[in-house]
Amino acid sequence: MLTGQECLEVSDSRITASTVEMLDCDKEYDIAVIDEAQMVADDDRGHSWTRAILGTLAGEIHICMSPVAKDVVIHLINLCHDEYEIREYERKTALKLEDKPFSFPQDVREGDAFIVFSKKSVLNIAGRLEENGIKPSVIYGSLPPEIRRRQMTLFNEKKTQVVVSTDAIGMGLNLPVRRIVFLEVEKFDGVSRRPLVISEIKQIAGRAGRFGLYDTGYVTALGQKNLNYLKNTLNIPEQDIDIVSLGFPQVLLTMDAPLDAIIKLWHEAEPSAPFRKINVDEILFLYGYAYKERYFIADFDDKYLLYKMITCPIDIKDRELVRQWLRYCMSYTSDISLDKPDKHSKYQGLMKYESYYKKLDLYYQFSVRMGKIVEEDWLENERDKTQAKIMQLLSKSKDEYIIRCRYCGRILPIGNSRNICRDCYSMIRR
C-alpha cells in the first residue's frame, strides 16, 4: 500500500493499492480500479481523480462512482477515444432515516457512529461519552494513519462501543456501523461555515449498515431541527456533477518566465467546460515564502525542482511545519539525507505529538520528492514511539477536552458556539 505518508510492502504481492495522488501514470497495469470517482469535482483533491481517469495505463479500468458522476466521467473517457461499458449496482443493505431525533446521551447505542466536523468536537464528544461510561474510538484528519487503523480495530473487536468521527469516516474506512448520528449538520470548509450538501450527507450516511452484519443501516441527527434538515435535503434530487477539477500542467514549466508568473497566467486563463482549475493559493504562498530566501536555495531558478518543492503537501496553517519545509528547501543539497525534524514544539499534549508526526511525514515526503536517502530504521522507530504516545493519550480520560462554560464550568450543550452557558450569559447581559 502506497500513500504520501507511508509505504507498506508485502512480499510477492501482485496488487498495489494507493491513494489517487500516488498513482504512477508512467507504469502499465493489467487492471486498474479507480474508486470514489465522483471526487473529480472536489476543489482540493479532484484534479488527482481527473489525472487518474485520463492518464492510467491499463488494459482494463474499472471506475467506481456515485451515479451523479456518470455523465462527466463518460465525457472524460470520450476525450481519450476509449470504449466503455456501464454497470449499475444497488446498495446491498437498506438505509433508513429515523423518524425520531436523537437525544444525547440517552439514545446512544452500541454500533453508533457520531459525526462532527472538527478535532475539537470529536474529543469533546468522546469525553462526554466516557463520562457516561461509554468507550469510544475516535477518527479525525490529523491522526496518523496507523492510529486510525488501531482505533478502527478497537471498534471492530468491540473493545470500544461507538465511534466519534469527522467526515474522514466517509472515505476508505470499512467499519461495522449500525447507525450514523449527525451531531452537526454544518461544517467549516476552509472559507466559511456552511450546511452540508446532499452529496456529503449521502457519502457519510452510506457508512451505516455494513453488508453481512446488518440488514438495515440507520441515520439520524441530534435534535428535531437537524433531523428536519436531513429529511428535507435528502428529498431534493441530487444534481449531476458538471464540473471536473483540473490540475496545473507541468508541461508549462518550459515557458520562459518565473514559476509564479506561469502559475498565475495559467490560472487566469478560462478553461473550457466542464473543467475548473484548482486553487493555487497555497502553492503561491509557499513560492512566496521560498522566494524571500531564494539566494539560499540551490537551483532556485530550476522550475521543475522548485515546483516539486512548493507542491509538497503540508499544512500551511502549521507554521512550525512551514519553517521546517523552508529549512529543507535551503539545505537539501548539503547531505545525502535531510536533517531530522526538531522535537521541540510550542504545542502541548496530544497536539504536540500530532505535530511531530506531521514533521516526520514531511521529512519522508520531501526526501522522496528530492531523491534523498530516507533513514528508514530511525523513521520507523520515531513513528512507532510517537504513535504509542498518541494512543496512550487517547486511551486516557478526555475530560479536559469537554467544552465547558468559561465562567461556571458547566458542560455546554452540543453545538454551543459561545463557550458560555445560558445562565452566565444572561447574568453578564444584565
At which residue positions do the language-model features occur?
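Conserved helicase motor
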Residues: 2-10, 18-22, 119-120, 138-150, ...
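Conserved two-lobed SF2 helicase motor
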Residues: 12-26, 155-174
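Conserved ATPase-coupling elements of RecA-like P-loop NTPase cores
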Residues: 25-29, 37-50, 173-176
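Walker B catalytic acidic pair
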Residues: 35-37, 184
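Post-DEXD/H (motif II) to motif III coupling segment of the RecA-like Helicase ATP-binding lobe
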Residues: 38-90, 94
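Conserved strand-helix element at the start of the C-terminal RecA-like helicase core
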Residues: 62-64, 70, 107-132, 136-140, ...
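Conserved segment of the helicase C-terminal RecA-like domain
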Residues: 69, 175, 179-189, 193-234
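Non-catalytic terminal extensions of ATP-dependent helicases
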Residues: 249-430
